[in-house]
Amino acid sequence: MKFNFLSKSVQNYLINKASTLAEALPYIRQHTGKNIVIKYGGHAMGDAALAKKFSQDIGLIKEVGINPIIVHGGGPQIGAMLKKKNIKTKFVEGLRITDKKTVKIVEKVLSKDINKKIVSDINLTGGKAESFSGNINNLIQAKKLKIAIKESDSNIERILDLGFVGEPTKINIKKILISIKKGKIPVIAPLGIDKNGNTYNINADTVAGA
């Protein structure tokens, strides 16, 4: 019989992991075989150490039989790119007012830069992630988001036009389930598309909760 001798550091690592798994065992038993949606914020992914740990944890969740579905944000990264392009943006109720020029940058940052990086990070740590962008193949059908605000002086309510900021009307769950069935971890960029082919920037928390 062949024995593998482990270094002290590897032993400590395995002991720590075993301890973590022991603590998580009730949760694992409760959610084994279930699909869970995890929102991954832009601030967290900006820290290399946190990003690596997140990827490792997602791989571990998949290994124990739970199916993670990642919906990511990207606010800080979008802000940095807009600043680089000398494009000024305003926020209302935490939502970025998004014109046609801005939405193209938002789409690139979310679907091409951030999404691909998360998929790569998960794959590098041993997971099998698959990239999805909500505005491709009608994954996330959307409509323009309308929010009502009251004028402070007159108390009159008016509808604010946020541009290409949307909300989901329908999510094509079938495509995501096919990915999970293939053993993949879906990673979704929070973009949507309407019946006229317009792309919308959607809040990641809204997509995760849809």
Question: Where does each model-flagged region fall?
Answer:
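Nucleotide/pyrophosphate-binding catalytic subdomain
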Residues: M1-A210
